[in-house]
Amino acid sequence: MQYIKTFLIFIFLIISKIVIAQDEEELLSARVLGIENAPIIIEEYASMSCGHCASFHIQTLPEIKKKYIDTGRAKLLFRDFPLDRTAMLGSMVTQCMNEKQFFPVLNRLFQKQPEWTQSEDILESIFKTLQPLGIEKPMLLSCLEDNETNKNRWKLLLAGRDYAAKQKGVDATPTFFVNGKKVEGRF
C-alpha cells in the first residue's frame, strides 16, 4: 500500500511539473518574425501604447529586418507587455490575428499609434486604422467580445506581463534580450 501511495505522489509531481512547464511556455509564447533556427534571437517586450516601442517598429526594426531577419541571421520574438488599458485593447486585437495578419496589424497600429491611442473612441479608431488591411469591423469586435476565448487571452496577456516582470526583470518598454541577455539602453 505504501508503494502505491509513493508511486501516485511521484506521478502527481511529474504531471505537476509538466503542467507548470506548459503554463510557463504558454505565458512566454511569442509571435515570431524570421526563421525558426536563426542563430540570433532578439526578444522584444513592448506595449502597444508605448511611444518608444512605436519608434523602434517604425525606425529601427525595418533595418534590422533587412540586415538580419530577412537574411536568416536573426529572428524577432515579439511579446506583449501591456502597460495600460489602451495597450491592452491593442494587444487583444493583435493577439486575435492569425500568423499572416499579426505583424502587418502590429506594424500598422504602431505606425498610427498617436491617432488611435489618443482618440475619444479608441475602438472605432483602431477599426479605421486597420480597415486598409482588410480587417472588417465584425472580426475586430469578435476579438473583444465577452467570451471564454477572449477572457483567457486577457488573462494570459496579464499573466505573461507579470511573469516577465518578476522572472525576467522587465520593468519598462521596450525591453530587449539578445540571445537571452538583457540589452540596456537604446537598441
Specify the residue positions occupied by each region the protein language model found.
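Extracytoplasmic thiol/disulfide redox context detector
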Residues: M1-D84, N152-Q167
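Conserved short-loop catalytic and cofactor-binding motifs
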Residues: A30, F78-F81, P114, L141, ...
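Short N-terminal micro-motifs specific to bacterial/archaeal maturation
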Residues: L33-E36, E44, C96, T117, ...
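Solvent-exposed, flexible loop/coil residues
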Residues: E36-N37, R85, E120, P174, ...
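Residues at structural and domain junctions
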Residues: E36-P39, C50, R79, S91, ...
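Structural alpha/beta surface segment adjacent to cysteine/selenocysteine redox centers
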Residues: A46-M48, A54-Q131, E136
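C-terminal cap of thioredoxin/glutaredoxin-like
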Residues: S47, L61, F127-F187
